[in-house]
Amino acid sequence: MKQRWLLVLILCFFTTSLVMGIHGKHLINDDFNETALLLAFKQNSVKSDPNNVLGNWKYESGRGSCSWRGVSCSDDGRIVGLDLRNSGLTGTLNLVNLTALPNLQNLYLQGNYFSSGGDSSGSDCYLQVLDLSSNSISDYSMVDYVFSKCSNLVSVNISNNKLVGKLGFAPSSLQSLTTVDLSYNILSDKIPESFISDFPASLKYLDLTHNNLSGDFSDLSFGICGNLTFFSLSQNNLSGDKFPITLPNCKFLETLNISRNNLAGKIPNGEYWGSFQNLKQLSLAHNRLSGEIPPELSLLCKTLVILDLSGNTFSGELPSQFTACVWLQNLNLGNNYLSGDFLNTVVSKITGITYLYVAYNNISGSVPISLTNCSNLRVLDLSSNGFTGNVPSGFCSLQSSPVLEKILIANNYLSGTVPMELGKCKSLKTIDLSFNELTGPIPKEIWMLPNLSDLVMWANNLTGTIPEGVCVKGGNLETLILNNNLLTGSIPESISRCTNMIWISLSSNRLTGKIPSGIGNLSKLAILQLGNNSLSGNVPRQLGNCKSLIWLDLNSNNLTGDLPGELASQAGLVMPGSVSGKQFAFVRNEGGTDCRGAGGLVEFEGIRAERLERLPMVHSCPATRIYSGMTMYTFSANGSMIYFDISYNAVSGFIPPGYGNMGYLQVLNLGHNRITGTIPDSFGGLKAIGVLDLSHNNLQGYLPGSLGSLSFLSDLDVSNNNLTGPIPFGGQLTTFPVSRYANNSGLCGVPLRPCGSAPRRPITSRIHAKKQTVATAVIAGIAFSFMCFVMLVMALYRVRKVQKKEQKREKYIESLPTSGSCSWKLSSVPEPLSINVATFEKPLRKLTFAHLLEATNGFSAETMVGSGGFGEVYKAQLRDGSVVAIKKLIRITGQGDREFMAEMETIGKIKHRNLVPLLGYCKVGEERLLVYEYMKWGSLETVLHEKSSKKGGIYLNWAARKKIAIGAARGLAFLHHSCIPHIIHRDMKSSNVLLDEDFEARVSDFGMARLVSALDTHLSVSTLAGTPGYVPPEYYQSFRCTAKGDVYSYGVILLELLSGKKPIDPGEFGEDNNLVGWAKQLYREKRGAEILDPELVTDKSGDVELFHYLKIASQCLDDRPFKRPTMIQLMAMFKEMKADTEEDESLDEFSLKETPLVEESRDKEP
């Protein structure tokens, strides 16, 4: 018996050993396979690892991959998680290498630089959580792969990428899926009607924010929608005037955000909102909703916490039923047309409200004292209404809100004094009472508020002084904006304790005394405005210690002493973005000496643009221009000030040569002082300078030739000095009017008298000289007569040998003010190019003006092929047989010259197949000529709109029109995104799209173009650009040209191609309408087919494609600039439709590597 048991034990031992050996071998193999897959991911997907995150990802015998950085394993050694968040990895993501891991459940790769690529058709995966957010993934097939293969998926986040294309199918089979986030991508086209309803019932979170998705909102089906708690379609292109009938099925929704779309019509009434049991946040902001706010919306009051209806066209009042919103904390009704007494009768009874925004409405009467009942109120914004009476004094009493942080009542009609009771609001951080009619002093209690960061009360009639002791109890004050008041006294020394100060504006008051040197201790100070006061003493050298200073305005004071060279040594070196988040307006003085200073920067938060007309600097000056919506910034390295105005003082001494090192300086005004010495040659380093005023000083010496290289210079004034010598030829110096050089007795050259000709002396001096030199004059006269006789004989001999045509040409040339030559460019230049230089990089050969004159038959009408706002275009055949187009700029003082220089500095150095090449230039006296490559078919305007005329218009089928649309878009995209700095065209129109012999579109006429970069965004606009019918609506408000303005103009061109109609045609659209208005109305009414040219509909081109292009045109023509696509996104849309089938590396670059331009101002959100 014992032997049997022993045998059994031995068999069990061997069996167990065999099983364990086999199992161990499998474990080893599985571990090896998982390690190999991770190494394959590192090898195939990671091209750059700057932080050496994967440094320990190396195969070592005996050691598994569980110890590798970012890898997590189960207890039995299987890889279940990979976390490489924010590691800085770059490469092309091959997701299959990771999803092949059989036990991988959690994959976190967000915050890297992965692009899409590799195989997206792998086998099944077992991921539960996938986070690829904040990368550069563009291929939507990766989303389809994840939805189709990862059957256990619970959460997927691919937000903040560059996904393009249409939304695919919804993963109805993923029964565990709860979260899908595809926000902040470039997804486009119509949302499939069943896309939302096809998701499994488990879905709780769906975010499609900030794409280009379109379609009628009412067509969407939400199905049963049982568990959905978060749904956002904000910042898309949804339209329609009704809400989906199945949306109330989502009974458990907590957040519904469909803001920033194109929704029209009225908010649903009736019981539509009664089904929502848990809705806490509803945002319908920034659409086109109209009518009155329905009382039935208050059915949400039992749970509603946040309600945002701002940026629509609602009228009337907030219904009384909203008093039941006991949980409501955030109410935003701004930017509508609301009126009435609802603040008193309704809002004041919602005692739990914390944030109240009703700015930009039509509410009048007194500010209701009953608002003090809202004891939890933190932010009160009543800006830009019609409030009258006094500022309420009841806030922060024992019974009212002790937590009030912001009170904003700017741009109203309040009167009386600033209540001292506001000093009881110990939590107050921001007070903005600007643009009212307040009087009296600012109470001392307000100055002592411990948490006050923003004190803004400009444009009132405030009196009194700024008390000593500011910031003694703490340096929290960041912005002190009290300009345009009646303040007296001196600037207190204690202001130097405001160590967080960013912006000080005390200009246009009655301040006296000296500028405190302690201001130099404010290392965060970015803007200092003390102009138009009676300040005296020296400019403190300590201001050079303000390392963030970018804006210094000291004009119109009584300052003396030398200009401190320290201002150029350290300014603008740190604190990038130190004043971001502020809204500004710059009022530029263009009226010469009638108004002092270069202009003024004003805080623009909560101010309607039309109210700026009240400012003395606007209505008192003969010519001013207002730039609004600006965002100021500083530079992280090698920066400088961008604005320095110390004009109308009594400063003396020399100009420090270091001022020429301020490479970001855009405005330098030293005029009307007592400055001596010479203009530093280092001023050639002011590469961003736009306005340079050195007038009315005692400067001597020559104008430095280096000034001729300042490409951005649009206004120069050196008049009333003692300058001598010639005005440097070249650049823009010869294009400024005579008045800019006047009263410098020794200056000569264009536009003044020619150098070498003596200035005319007084009559008495000439008579005296004549009496002394009679004999000499007689002898000189005889000699001169003999010489003239000899020259006449020689001239007659030469004339007999010259043809009549040559005679006429020579006489014409001799009649010109000065002689000149043409420069002809032989070879191309690589693209893209930096265009900050004033000369071409390739050799030039000479052509005489006579050659161009001969080629155009004296610029006769027979050779003229077109004309525009800035000149005429002639066809010219040169002696070598080549045909060119010559643009002769009109001779308008200043404008033609500025046009000429702008052309030379931009298009002359740019080569692209969809741009008209500038071949050469010519400048002869007052003549300004540009020589272009000749385009056989002329302009799109002529070809498209003159089919039936005798001017050679021809029929364009859809294939030709599509080719033209894509070519023009490609050229404009090149200007916006590949030129460094970027270029805004400013005058895109069909007459500026030329067609070569192959009907390839070429964008032409950059006469209105200005370089756009971080240096030139806000101060460089000198004329309102554009042609009627093509000008975007925002240009009439801010006068600021933007890339999105070009996109709008391109949308008009695309609409022309689709409709065959002109942008403005009173016979077609009436006197009060145009093509855009007509098309938008039809599009809203779902009559888009009526927009299309009948010739295209019968052209077998495919209605679907036509409507795709019509939808793109509609997006380009959105009234809101931020809703328009960029040209990169447009090219991506064309590529998605496979419209651009050519191999185009630059297009691929646009599609996959989009970089933001200078950010355009969006509608301000609280």
Curated annotation (Swiss-Prot):
Residues 1142-1166 are annotated as: Disordered. Its main location: membrane. A motif (Cys pair 1) lies at residues 66-73. InterPro entries: BRI1_island_dom (IPR045381), Kinase-like_dom_sf (IPR011009), Leu-rich_rpt (IPR001611), Leu-rich_rpt_typical-subtyp (IPR003591), LRR_dom_sf (IPR032675), LRR_N_plant-typ (IPR013210), Plant_RL_S/T_kinase (IPR051716), Prot_kinase_dom (IPR000719). Residues 859-1147 form the Protein kinase domain. Contains two pairs of conservatively spaced Cys (Cys pair 1 and 2) possibly involved in forming some heterodimers. A 70 amino acid island between the 19th and the 20th LRR is essential for the binding of brassinosteroids. This is Serine/threonine-protein kinase BRI1-like 1. The lineage of its organism: Eukaryota, Viridiplantae, Streptophyta, Embryophyta, Tracheophyta.
